[in-house]
Amino acid sequence: MIKLLFMGTPQFSATVLKGLLDNPAYEILGVVTQPDRAVGRKKDIKVTPVKQLALEHGISIYQPEKLSGSQELIEIMELGADGIITAAFGQFLPTILLDSVSFAINVHASLLPKYRGGAPIHYAIMNGDKEAGVTIMEMIKEMDAGDMVAKASTPILETDNVGTLFEKLAIIGRDLLLDSLPAYLSGELKPIPQDHSQATFSPNISPEQEKLDWTMSDQEVFNHIRGMNPWPVAHTFLEGQRLKIYEAQLAEGEGLPGQVIVKTKKSLVIAAGQGALSLLVVQPAGKPKMAIADFLNGLGRKLEVGDFIGR
C-alpha cells in the first residue's frame, strides 16, 4: 500500500481525494488544506470540502495559514509518506517537503503549459476557449512547470460556467490520476517536459476583473459572465449600486455600450460594444439572487429603454 499525503481545498480537490480513499492501493496518512474561513453576512465558519471529507474518514488534518516554516510542516514530514498528491491546494510546497518524499504529483485543471496558476477554469471560459482539460504533472519549485505525466481534455459548452466545468474536470482529474499513477510509479509511464516557451498564466481573479466592461462584444461579455459564475460573480452598477449578474444570453439588437435597448415585464436587454445580451439572473446589493422578471418587478422597474447601466 502506497502511503500518501494529500493537499487541496475546494470540491475539485475533494473529488480527487475521494477517488484515492476508495482505492485500496493507497493510504492517506493526512490532508493539508486551507484554514477554516468566516463566510457570508453572518460570518459563519466554513470548513473546506477536503477537511469535511477527511473528518468523515478519520484522517489527520493540517491547516497552516502558510505551510513553509510552520510547525505543521514538521509534523507532516514526520508522517513518513511515500508521496504527495496535490489538487488546487493554493500554496507553494517547500523544497524540504518535496525532497522528503519519493514523488510529488499535482492534478492541475488546464492543458499545460497553458494556464499555469490558480484560476485556469475561469480564464478558459472568459477567453472563449473551445476545450479545457486536466494535466497530471510532477511538482517542482516553479509553479505548474513540472514534467507532464498525463493529459485529458473535454469540450467547453456554451452552457458551461465555472461551476459546471469545475465539476466535469474534477471527475476527469480523479480518473486520470487513478489511471496514470500506477504506470508512473512503476516507471512504465515517462513524464514529458513542458514547452516553457508556450506557457501562459491564470492568476487569481482580481476584484477589478469582476466588473463587466460593456464596451466588449456581446460574446466577450457573455463569456465573462460565465467565467465568473458561481464565483466570484461578475457585476455592473445601477444607480451607483452593485448589481451582480449570474446568467445572461446573447440577444438581438444594437445600442451604445451599457444601454437598455429592450425592457418588458420579463426581459431586460443591454447593448454591448457589439451586439447585446438579455440578463436572466441577477442579484442587487443586499438582496438575494433573483430571476430578471422579479428584479424588473422591484428595483428594476424604474429602468427605461435608453437608460444606462455600468456607469
Swiss-Prot record:
Is-annotated flag, keyword Methyltransferase? no
Binding locations of (6S)-5,6,7,8-tetrahydrofolate:
S110, L111, L112, P113
Q: Which InterPro entries match?
A: Fmt (IPR005794), Formyl_trans_C (IPR005793), Formyl_trans_C_sf (IPR037022), Formyl_transf_N (IPR002376), Formyl_transf_N_sf (IPR036477), Formyl_transferase-like_C_sf (IPR011034), GART_AS (IPR001555), Met-tRNA-FMT_C (IPR044135)
Q: Which UniProt keywords are present, listed alphabetically?
A: Protein biosynthesis, Transferase
Q: Which GO terms describe its molecular function?
A: methionyl-tRNA formyltransferase activity
Documented EC number(s): 2.1.2.9
Keyword Nucleotide-binding assigned to the entry: answer is no
Describe the reaction catalysed, as an equation: L-methionyl-tRNA(fMet) + (6R)-10-formyltetrahydrofolate = N-formyl-L-methionyl-tRNA(fMet) + (6S)-5,6,7,8-tetrahydrofolate + H(+)
Q: Which GO terms describe its cellular component?
A: cytosol
- Record's family? Belongs to the Fmt family.
Purpose of the protein: Attaches a formyl group to the free amino group of methionyl-tRNA(fMet). The formyl group appears to play a dual role in the initiator identity of N-formylmethionyl-tRNA by promoting its recognition by IF2 and preventing the misappropriation of this tRNA by the elongation apparatus.
- What is the protein name stated in its UniProt record? Methionyl-tRNA formyltransferase
Per the record, the gene is fmt
